[in-house]
Amino acid sequence: MKPFKALTARQQEVYDLLKRHLENTGMPPTRAEISKELGFRSPNAAEEHLKALARKGVIEIISGTSRGIRLLLEESESDENQGLPLVGRVAAGEPILAEQHIEGTYQVDANMFKPQANFLLKVYGQSMKNIGILDGDLLAVHSTKDVRNGQIVVARIEDEVTVKRLERKGSVIYLHAENEEFAPIVVDLNQQPNFEIEGIAVGIIRNNAWM
């Protein structure tokens, strides 16, 4: 892959923390969380490092939200890289990666994400805007059914696919938006058998940056 501009040791620490936090929680850390984790005296120090990473093209800072940070990727030069499939509309009862659901392929190295991404899903709407997942974004997804409370998951109810924060209490699933204008989706597994967890969010890509 094309390299980013060289990072200082401290900038690399911040970048690695961003990736690790996304992997563990499905969302970027706040400035306060970065400062606490890396021992900065104030969130302002974290902000300065984030601005430096943005100038080097490694991340994008989204104003208006405390978690408005996106990791940006460089396009792979390898002809052997098959890229990641973009999943479109999904029919009930069929695998999410069935051929008829694939709208195209984006030349993104799956190994840039931890854990590895298996597919991309286009985001519709503003239900997750408070953590920087915006309408039109491409969400990188790791296929797994092994999920934890608090993770950002891709869930399927019948033929509807949604991206939400997971909370499970017994047989009841709560899918929480990151936007106070949206109520949680409540799924009782005893009454809704056509419910599947398709994976966890492992990154975000701007839709207009790739193809």
From Swiss-Prot:
What NCBIfam families does its record include? lexA
Signal peptide (residue range) = none
Chain's role: Represses a number of genes involved in the response to DNA damage (SOS response), including recA and lexA. In the presence of single-stranded DNA, RecA interacts with LexA causing an autocatalytic cleavage which disrupts the DNA-binding part of LexA, leading to derepression of the SOS regulon and eventually DNA repair.
Provide the residue ranges listed under DNA-binding region in this record.
Answer: 31-51
Under the heading InterPro entries, the entry gives:
LexA (IPR006200), LexA-like (IPR039418), LexA/Signal_pep-like_sf (IPR036286), LexA_DNA-bd_dom (IPR006199), LexA_repressor (IPR050077), Peptidase_S24_LexA (IPR006197), Peptidase_S24_S26A/B/C (IPR015927), WH-like_DNA-bd_sf (IPR036388)
EC numbers: 3.4.21.88
Q: Name one GO molecular function term.
A: DNA binding
Top-rank EC class of the record's enzyme: hydrolase
**HAMAP family in alphabetical order:** LexA
Task: Spell out the SUPFAM superfamilies in the cross-references.
Answer: LexA/Signal peptidase, Winged helix' DNA-binding domain
Q: Where is the active site?
A: S127, K164
Q: Where is this site: Cleavage?
A: A92, G93
Q: Which UniProt keywords apply?
A: Autocatalytic cleavage, DNA damage, DNA repair, DNA replication, DNA-binding, Hydrolase, Repressor, SOS response, Transcription, Transcription regulation
- Spell out the Gene3D superfamilies in the cross-references: Umud Fragment, subunit A (2.10.109.10), Winged helix-like DNA-binding domain superfamily/Winged helix DNA-binding domain (1.10.10.10)
GO biological process terms, alphabetically, are:
DNA repair; DNA replication; negative regulation of DNA-templated transcription; proteolysis; SOS response
Q: Which domain of life is it from?
A: Bacteria
Annotated protein name in UniProt: LexA repressor
The family this protein is said to belong to:
Belongs to the peptidase S24 family.
Q: Which organism is it from?
A: Pasteurella multocida (strain Pm70)
What reaction does this catalyse? Hydrolysis of Ala-|-Gly bond in repressor LexA
CDD domains tied to this protein:
S24_LexA-like
